[in-house]
């Protein structure tokens, strides 16, 4: 069975288990694809990173450098770009446009220009929503990695190959770049705290445009449900994407110790991807895009329960 056929079979299984495809919130949906790529290219599964984006190719900027991949050197990345299907007469032109855009967005993750997040090879695929056929777009590869290059040409005959030299920088340049990136990340000021119900619906958001946060910062927040009651949470900043800052719950005051009553929080690896795909206005800094009721309206908070540095805004 050919490499592409194995990928198509795995992607068909993925769609069967996760009808939302690349927008699914599952963190394990790509496991079989990762295994196939690992076996085909003769590298470890931990050296293969698989991701995807729905409709917006520019989101690969976020996908390649998210979570544990940030500032990490990994052997290979695989990206699926999912878009609505088109008539056969438009297919060739669409593939060309998608390929060019995907290469432009992805190349900096291969040549070493993107914040230290780097891959020796990047496989780009096009898929149509709800369909299982996989269209190879291009393979981006570090010019000195002859093993990956030869394997790609063997496994996907005729694939467009893009070779890149690795950008060389002095330690001083690297330090300056790191400092600049840290400043850029800390300058984000649009903060969104996302809570998720058991059914996956988002029930609350709070935004604060007067503060800036870094990953790892701890935040105290109170969510008022009526004139006298509130739910107080300790939050940790776990991701900064564009103007979006996402926090994970660390502790919750004045609620029963019952896991069924606790709010479910966004999983940064995949749920954030789906959230951004489903709510594109978040990336434009829009306000008021989420509303709903707070879980446990009977929760009460007294001033004695709050930490000393808590600010009730």
From Swiss-Prot:
<dbReference type="GO" id="GO:0009036">
    <property type="term" value="F:type II site-specific deoxyribonuclease activity"/>
</dbReference>
<keyword id="KW-0680">Restriction system</keyword>
<keyword id="KW-0255">Endonuclease</keyword>
<comment type="function">
    <text>A P subtype restriction enzyme that recognizes the double-stranded sequence 5'-CTCGAG-3'; the cleavage site is unknown.</text>
</comment>
<feature type="region of interest" description="Disordered">
    <location>
        <begin position="289"/>
        <end position="313"/>
    </location>
</feature>
<dbReference type="GO" id="GO:0009307">
    <property type="term" value="P:DNA restriction-modification system"/>
</dbReference>
<protein>
    <recommendedName>
        <fullName>Type II restriction enzyme BsuMI component YdiR</fullName>
        <ecNumber>3.1.21.4</ecNumber>
    </recommendedName>
</protein>
<comment type="subunit">
    <text>BsuMI restriction activity requires YdiR, YdiS and YdjA.</text>
</comment>
<keyword id="KW-0540">Nuclease</keyword>
<keyword id="KW-0378">Hydrolase</keyword>
